[in-house]
Amino acid sequence: MKSCILLCGGMSRRMGRDKGSMKIHNKPMIIHILEALNNQIDELVIVLNDDNRIRKYKKIITQKNYSFKIYFTIDIENDLGPLCGIMTGLEKINSDYALVLPCDSPYIDSDFVYYMFDTLESILENEDNESLMALVPYHRSPNDVDIIKRAEPLHSIYHKSYIPLIDEFLQNNIRKVRVLMKNQNCLYIPIDNHLINVNNFKNLNRPTDIEE
């Protein structure tokens, strides 16, 4: 089973309004992402911050349009950032791994989704990699130094065994997502326009980003 977690529980302070429902090219951002996921995954867990937003997104999304099951869930704790959203989603999935995506990246394409899961499957065929915790894209640089700083943690695949670790991080007021990559069995895959288009990682955070 291929699972995906879509993080829609952010406060959107820089944008000034809920991002996932904002229209770009005549469609809500979240619809662009769901179309990229279609025929690529089996289930999608959408993490939101309250019942009102769940009702709002249920009006935007109709289950019959997609090949995968859609589940809506409320973030375990509001305003703790994407790290808490990842934990919430991992607790709901019916598989061991999930691709985590943000709701403000409308240029995610199906090739990226396919590549991530295909790479994961190839890795897991090797018994030596059964303990893999995360599959993380990163931007290349000379000598590939400081990979963690150039990684894309919100476009990555995580194992649900992260749940107790994330809970511990949050209990200690550690909220940065990049902490998931430290001292863990993570595999980094380089972002290359021939395999992974860099547009997949473009976030729309401010009104001016949409106007560009």
Regions from the language model: what does each represent?
Residues H159, R206:
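Short, conserved phosphate/pyrophosphate- and ester-handling motifs at nucleotide-, phospho-/glycolipid
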Residues N203:
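PAPS-dependent sulfotransferase catalytic core
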Residues M1-L154, K160-N200:
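Nucleotide and nucleotide-moiety/phosphate-recognizing core
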